[in-house]
Amino acid sequence: MIEAIEQGYRYFGCGGALGFDTLAAQTVLRLREIYPEIRLILVLPCRDQTRGWKQADVAEYDRIMKAADKVTYTSEQYYSGCMHKRNRHLVDNSSLCICYLTEQSGGTAYTVNYARSQGLKIINIAE
Protein backbone atom coordinates (compact mmCIF):
# COMPACT_ATOMS: atom_id res chain seq x y z
CA MET A 1 0.00 0.00 0.00
CA ILE A 2 2.86 2.34 0.69
CA GLU A 3 3.96 2.00 -2.93
CA ALA A 4 0.44 2.89 -4.08
CA ILE A 5 0.39 5.94 -1.80
CA GLU A 6 3.78 7.04 -3.10
CA GLN A 7 2.40 6.68 -6.65
CA GLY A 8 -0.39 9.13 -5.77
CA TYR A 9 -3.28 6.86 -4.78
CA ARG A 10 -5.30 8.53 -2.03
CA TYR A 11 -8.63 6.69 -1.83
CA PHE A 12 -8.75 3.07 -0.74
CA GLY A 13 -12.02 1.20 -1.11
CA CYS A 14 -12.62 -1.86 1.02
CA GLY A 15 -15.51 -4.34 1.11
CA GLY A 16 -15.68 -4.89 4.86
CA ALA A 17 -15.57 -8.71 4.79
CA LEU A 18 -13.73 -10.85 7.31
CA GLY A 19 -10.15 -11.75 6.43
CA PHE A 20 -8.23 -9.74 3.86
CA ASP A 21 -10.77 -6.89 3.73
CA THR A 22 -10.41 -6.39 7.48
CA LEU A 23 -6.61 -6.52 7.29
CA ALA A 24 -6.60 -4.05 4.39
CA ALA A 25 -8.87 -1.61 6.24
CA GLN A 26 -6.74 -1.86 9.39
CA THR A 27 -3.64 -1.18 7.29
CA VAL A 28 -5.17 1.91 5.67
CA LEU A 29 -6.13 3.24 9.10
CA ARG A 30 -2.60 2.68 10.43
CA LEU A 31 -1.04 4.26 7.35
CA ARG A 32 -3.38 7.25 7.64
CA GLU A 33 -1.44 8.20 10.78
CA ILE A 34 1.68 8.61 8.59
CA TYR A 35 -0.11 9.73 5.40
CA PRO A 36 -3.05 11.84 6.63
CA GLU A 37 -4.14 12.56 3.05
CA ILE A 38 -5.30 8.98 2.39
CA ARG A 39 -8.93 7.99 2.83
CA LEU A 40 -10.68 4.73 3.71
CA ILE A 41 -13.97 4.19 1.91
CA LEU A 42 -15.99 1.19 3.03
CA VAL A 43 -18.23 -0.23 0.32
CA LEU A 44 -20.50 -2.64 2.12
CA PRO A 45 -22.93 -5.12 0.55
CA CYS A 46 -25.77 -4.62 3.05
CA ARG A 47 -26.50 -3.23 6.49
CA ASP A 48 -26.72 -6.68 8.10
CA GLN A 49 -23.40 -7.99 6.76
CA THR A 50 -22.22 -8.97 10.25
CA ARG A 51 -25.19 -11.25 10.97
CA GLY A 52 -23.78 -14.49 12.38
CA TRP A 53 -20.29 -13.07 13.04
CA LYS A 54 -18.41 -13.54 16.32
CA GLN A 55 -18.77 -10.67 18.78
CA ALA A 56 -15.06 -9.76 18.53
CA ASP A 57 -15.30 -9.54 14.72
CA VAL A 58 -18.38 -7.33 14.95
CA ALA A 59 -16.58 -5.05 17.43
CA GLU A 60 -13.63 -4.65 15.05
CA TYR A 61 -16.00 -4.06 12.11
CA ASP A 62 -17.75 -1.32 14.13
CA ARG A 63 -14.40 0.26 15.04
CA ILE A 64 -13.34 0.31 11.38
CA MET A 65 -16.71 1.77 10.34
CA LYS A 66 -16.37 4.60 12.85
CA ALA A 67 -12.84 5.37 11.65
CA ALA A 68 -13.67 5.19 7.93
CA ASP A 69 -13.89 8.42 5.96
CA LYS A 70 -16.98 7.23 4.08
CA VAL A 71 -19.34 4.26 4.29
CA THR A 72 -21.49 3.24 1.31
CA TYR A 73 -24.01 0.40 1.14
CA THR A 74 -24.72 -1.13 -2.26
CA SER A 75 -27.93 -2.76 -0.92
CA GLU A 76 -30.07 -2.22 2.15
CA GLN A 77 -30.62 -5.93 2.89
CA TYR A 78 -28.80 -9.14 2.13
CA TYR A 79 -29.78 -11.03 -1.02
CA SER A 80 -27.94 -13.70 -2.99
CA GLY A 81 -26.21 -11.26 -5.37
CA CYS A 82 -25.34 -8.45 -2.98
CA MET A 83 -21.69 -9.46 -2.56
CA HIS A 84 -21.15 -9.46 -6.33
CA LYS A 85 -22.86 -6.06 -6.54
CA ARG A 86 -20.51 -4.71 -3.86
CA ASN A 87 -17.46 -6.17 -5.63
CA ARG A 88 -18.46 -4.71 -9.00
CA HIS A 89 -19.03 -1.31 -7.37
CA LEU A 90 -15.53 -1.43 -5.91
CA VAL A 91 -14.01 -2.29 -9.30
CA ASP A 92 -16.15 0.20 -11.24
CA ASN A 93 -14.92 3.01 -8.98
CA SER A 94 -11.23 2.04 -8.89
CA SER A 95 -8.11 2.18 -11.02
CA LEU A 96 -6.04 -0.23 -8.90
CA CYS A 97 -6.91 -3.59 -7.34
CA ILE A 98 -4.84 -4.72 -4.34
CA CYS A 99 -5.80 -8.30 -3.55
CA TYR A 100 -4.74 -11.55 -1.92
CA LEU A 101 -5.67 -14.15 -4.54
CA THR A 102 -4.65 -17.79 -4.09
CA GLU A 103 -7.50 -19.64 -5.84
CA GLN A 104 -8.68 -19.39 -9.43
CA SER A 105 -12.35 -19.78 -8.52
CA GLY A 106 -14.67 -18.11 -6.05
CA GLY A 107 -15.64 -14.53 -5.30
CA THR A 108 -12.14 -13.10 -5.11
CA ALA A 109 -11.11 -14.70 -8.41
CA TYR A 110 -14.31 -13.45 -10.07
CA THR A 111 -13.67 -9.92 -8.82
CA VAL A 112 -10.00 -9.87 -9.81
CA ASN A 113 -10.88 -11.20 -13.27
CA TYR A 114 -13.54 -8.50 -13.60
CA ALA A 115 -11.01 -5.87 -12.49
CA ARG A 116 -8.54 -7.14 -15.07
CA SER A 117 -11.23 -7.02 -17.79
CA GLN A 118 -11.90 -3.39 -16.85
CA GLY A 119 -8.22 -2.49 -17.26
CA LEU A 120 -7.32 -2.08 -13.60
CA LYS A 121 -3.75 -2.57 -12.48
CA ILE A 122 -3.64 -5.67 -10.23
CA ILE A 123 -1.33 -6.06 -7.25
CA ASN A 124 -1.69 -9.58 -5.84
CA ILE A 125 0.25 -9.67 -2.59
CA ALA A 126 -0.10 -13.47 -2.48
CA GLU A 127 2.35 -13.76 -5.40
Predicted regions and their residues:
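Acidic/glycine-enriched connector segments
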Residues: 1-127
